[in-house]
A protein has these predicted regions:
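Active-site gating loops and adjacent loop-to-helix segments of metal-dependent hydrolytic enzymes
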Residues: 71-82, 126-150, 193-205, 216-229, ...
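Divalent metal-dependent hydrolysis catalytic cores, especially in the metallo-beta-lactamase
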Residues: 52, 67-96, 111-125, 151-161, ...
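Active-site loop-to-helix "anion-binding N-cap" substructures in soluble metabolic enzymes
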Residues: 46, 53-59, 82-92, 208-225
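N-terminal metal-binding scaffold of metallo-dependent hydrolase/deaminase domains
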Residues: 1-31, 357
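C-terminal cap of metal-dependent C-N hydrolases
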Residues: 4-6, 326, 336-368
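Active-site core of metal-dependent hydrolases
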Residues: 148-268
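His/Asp/Glu-enriched, well-ordered alpha-helical/loop segment
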Residues: 219-229, 249-258, 263-340, 344-347
Length: 368
């Protein structure tokens, strides 16, 4: 590749990245400060752990939608992602999981890599559905086992206050499933207990959870006081920049997601979100009653938004690549170093995306 300011695991290097057979062979160059030159930035590819759709398609539509969704998000620098389900009848969830499980075994040319599934519901509080359809129910281990047999479920969002969910958190976290607290009316104490039981993150922090109050800290308070990881939607609509800064100061490995819907990468109009019809307008996606319903955010815009509120480019990149990879326990993605997958994005000095590579493949994203 041409000479760039390359963000490596050890800092900025002015030089070139050499790759072969999809993996990084070497990074040749010298340490630098990007402020001293006008070269482009070469960053690790973005890893989005919360994707419902894009390009007019929704994950819940099944196999026919996946290639469109992954081709849409790669155009904006997402090189790998988790396909995220909606709360739905169990047979519908099973059908989608089976299709995702099969799709994970391949990566069509020109697409982002699907790393697995984020099961967002149905094990959530019906009083905090947000944009989720009303199919929430208490988790049953037999049902979860059926789901796990169909696809690599990496993350499950769960409301810890529901009876029996503490046992599920213990059982599944011990098997490597990341259990996230979300869509919950739980108390501060219930949030802390869930973390002690093995929960490891929070789903779209601040949104669809009991808020912080100085006498009732709620789930938000549990996250700010105790979490190492949490996901946050940095579209500047879901969370005020001031609240974003509070979370960034409090949660060491806060990482950012899009929570993107079918409307991502598309013009204003009506789109599907699970069984709902949502409307994209004024930069957001909403239900008919005005409730925010996922986002239209893309990861390159997430980077620009983080920089806009004051983060250095290196830290913004870390929260879009390295921290999501670390959270999933993935060492071969999310960082540019020898032996890692050659997943990277190039941006000009205005942070406009100019090139994307997935597993060594140059993506023709402008004509996708």
């Amino acid at each position: 590749m041409s000479e760039d300011n390359i963000l490596t695991a050890d800092g900025w290097i002015r030089g070139r990245l050499v790759h072969e057979h999809g993996k990084i062979l070497s990074i040749e160059g010298v340490p630098c400060d990007p402020a001293d030159n006008d070269l482009p930035y070469l960053l690790p590819g973005f890893i989005d752990l919360h994707v419902h759709g894009g390009g007019g398609k929704d994950i819940m539509e099944g196999a026919t939608a996946f290639e469109t969704i992954t081709r849409t998000h790669v155009r904006f620098g997402t090189t790998s992602l988790l396909a995220t389900t909606m709360t739905a009848p169990s047979e519908e969830i099973s059908s989608v999981l089976k299709a995702v499980g099969e799709f994970c075994e391949q990566r069509p040319s020109g697409s982002a890599r699907v790393l697995g599934v984020h099961l967002e519901g149905p094990y959530i509080n019906p009083g905090k559905l947000g944009a989720q359809p009303n199919f929430a129910h208490t988790a049953l281990m037999a049902e979860v086992e059926e789901y796990l047999a169909l696809a690599p479920i990496r993350v499950i969002t769960i409301a810890p206050e529901i009876a029996g969910h503490d046992a599920l958190i213990r059982a599944l976290s011990s098997r490597g499933v990341r259990m996230q607290i979300g869509h919950t009316l739980g108390s501060y104490e219930e949030g802390v207990a869930a973390l002690a039981a093995g929960a490891s993150s929070f789903t779209h922090l601040y949104n669809a959870m009991s808020p912080l109050h100085h006498r009732e800290p709620g789930i938000v308070g549990a996250a700010l006081a105790h979490a190492k990881y949490a996901e946050l939607i940095p579209d500047l609509l879901h969370v005020h920049p001031g609240a974003m800064r509070v979370a960034l100061r409090s949660i060491p490995c806060l990482y950012c997601v899009t929570d993107s819907t079918a409307a991502a990468g598309m013009p204003d109009g009506e789109y599907k979100l699970g069984s709902h019809t949502v409307t994209k307008c004024l930069g957001g996606v909403r239900l008919p009653d005005g409730t925010l319903a996922g986002s239209t955010l893309t990861m390159d815009q997430a980077l620009r938004n983080l920089v806009k509120i004051g983060l250095p480019i290196a830290e913004a990149s870390q929260r879009l690549s390295q921290f999501p990879a670390d959270y999933l326990g993935i060492t071969e993605r999310g960082r540019l170093q020898p032996g890692a997958w050659a997943d990277c994005v190039r941006l000009d000095r205005s942070l406009t995306l100019t090139a994307v590579m997935v597993e060594g493949e140059d993506i023709d994203f402008k004509n996708a």
